[in-house]
From Swiss-Prot:
Ranges of residues in domain TsaA-like: 9-140
Record-stated family: Belongs to the tRNA methyltransferase O family.
Chain sites annotated for binding S-adenosyl-L-methionine: P26, I27, Q28, H65, R66, R89, L120, D121, G122, T123
Keywords attached to this entry: S-adenosyl-L-methionine
SUPFAM superfamilies, alphabetized: YaeB-like (SSF118196)
InterPro entries, per database record: TrmO-like_N (IPR023370), UPF0066_cons_site (IPR023368), YaeB-like (IPR040372), YaeB-like_sf (IPR036413), YaeB_N_sf (IPR036414)
Domain of life assignment: Archaea
Taxonomy of the source species: Archaea, Methanobacteriati, Methanobacteriota, Thermococci, Thermococcales
UniProt name for this protein: Probable S-adenosyl-L-methionine-binding protein PYRAB06630
Keyword S-adenosyl-L-methionine: yes
């Protein structure tokens, strides 16, 4: 079987948050209690939001558009030893895809108001899925090297180690310069 060299995804929207730079972004949504943001779904995808407001939480799948891949061994947040990138949640990955479970506060048309946001402003949104505990929660899990470090999560913030200062957005900058469009 021959695999394609490239797989292309088209953003379905933009995530807006108070975090304009990677530094100081909470490193997980569970450490971003009550931080508000919005999801602006592009109009051509807004029909797909039908009934989303019936869910209290949603899963956002997005592209780490400013992450800079540095290799398969990384020194993750909350630990000073290198680990394989696939044993971490570091944003700099071969395929820089992020996921966050956030609270859905309100939907107005193609705009979703959310809380517990740990995402950089202007992040391209790839997909949205409803969070369903019966599907998504697992029991008797092992968390590897994080077992000794998970207590650091609440205060852990991005220090910029995985991000590049030079980047190109994959859609028009004018969309990113109009955050007032995303306000409810």
């Amino acid at each position: 079987m021959v695999l394609p060299l490239m797989i292309c995804y088209r953003p379905i929207g933009i995530i807006h948050s108070p975090f304009k730079e990677p530094k100081d972004v909470p490193i997980q949504a569970s450490a971003a209690k009550d931080i508000e943001g919005t999801v602006e779904v592009f109009p051509e995808f807004s029909e797909g939001l039908k009934d989303i407001e019936e869910f209290s939480h949603i899963i956002l799948i997005y592209h780490f558009h400013r992450a800079k891949f540095k290799g398969l061994l990384v020194e993750p947040y909350m630990h000073e030893e290198k680990h394989g990138v696939f044993a971490t949640r570091a944003p700099a990955r071969p395929n820089p895809i992020g996921i966050s479970v956030v609270r859905l506060v309100e939907r107005k048309g193609n705009i979703l108001r959310i809380r517990d946001v740990d995402i950089l402003d202007g992040t391209p949104l790839l997909d949205i899925k409803p969070y369903v505990p019966e599907f998504d929660v697992r029991e008797n899990v092992r968390i590897g090297w994080l077992e000794k470090n998970v207590h650091k999560l609440e205060k852990a913030r991005d220090d910029g180690r995985f991000f590049s200062l030079n980047f190109n957005y994959i859609f028009p900058a004018s969309l990113l310069e109009a955050p007032e469009r995303a306000k409810l």
